[in-house]
């Protein structure tokens, strides 16, 4: 999120920080599930959902309530209903769809057009993915325990399919309705899928070649910070995922499969 703030406030460009946010969220979530599948442990989806949203919702609810209160105090009554709708959409993790269906253009908005809840769109996509991803891991676990796949090939099959489908749809919809595509969960799932695929690969990767790890880590970190400044990331498919993969793989190198 620091990338988003720095680029929006001081540089005036899109940083790709949201892509970083989604990628890392998926990577960390997936490490836990991949270890459970690899060790033959129960996934306990309900317990996971309860734990995650019990952690996320209280802080989000406080921000939403305070933002709504400030909006009703500061803004004219003309805007109150719209802000109440935004607050509800943010609380229940569908703010991205609320903005997409409201024909909001992220890149063409004036200050007066922006909602104080707009930043919840990326958190909404994260929340939706936190609901969907455990189900997909359950499918991967089924392939492992019933179809006799190994854990990594099972994950690659499930999440590779998600990646290819989402990426292809993202290209198509961005060409058709770029403003809608920006907020569409379906055009963002491939970013989550990359994080998961990398997490799966770490089960087969071991530390090796210290200098290579250090160089890859710094190259990836530099790419993360500078992609938004050098490239028109608001118009092309971001290289942030490549930079992230390089950064995350810095501590790893391939071992025998």
Where are these regions (language model features)?
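Membrane-interface helix/loop caps of multi-pass membrane proteins
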Residues: 1-257
């Amino acid at each position: 999120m620091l990338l988003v703030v720095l680029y929006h406030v001081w540089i005036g460009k899109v940083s790709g920080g949201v892509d970083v946010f989604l990628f890392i969220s998926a990577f960390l979530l997936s490490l836990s599930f991949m270890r459970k599948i690899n060790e033959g442990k129960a996934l306990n989806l309900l317990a996971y959902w309860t734990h995650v949203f019990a952690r996320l919702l209280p802080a989000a609810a406080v921000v939403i309530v305070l933002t709504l209160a400030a909006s009703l105090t500061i803004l004219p009554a003309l805007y109150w209903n719209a802000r109440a709708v935004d607050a509800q959409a943010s609380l229940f993790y569908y703010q991205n769809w609320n903005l997409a269906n409201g024909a909001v253009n992220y890149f063409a908005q004036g200050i007066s057009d922006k909602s104080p809840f707009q930043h919840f769109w990326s958190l909404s996509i994260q929340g939706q993915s936190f609901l969907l991803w455990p189900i997909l891991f359950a499918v991967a676990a089924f392939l492992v325990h019933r179809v006799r796949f190994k854990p990594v090939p099972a994950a690659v099959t499930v999440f590779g399919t998600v990646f290819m489908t989402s990426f292809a749809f993202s290209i198509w919809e961005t060409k058709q309705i770029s403003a809608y595509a920006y907020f569409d969960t379906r055009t963002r799932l491939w970013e989550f899928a990359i994080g998961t695929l990398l997490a799966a690969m770490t089960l087969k990767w071991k530390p090796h070649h210290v200098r290579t790890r250090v160089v890859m880590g710094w190259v990836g970190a530099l790419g993360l910070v500078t992609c938004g400044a050098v490239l028109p990331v608001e118009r092309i498919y971001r290289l942030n995922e490549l930079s992230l993969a390089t950064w995350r793989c810095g501590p790893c190198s391939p071992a025998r499969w």
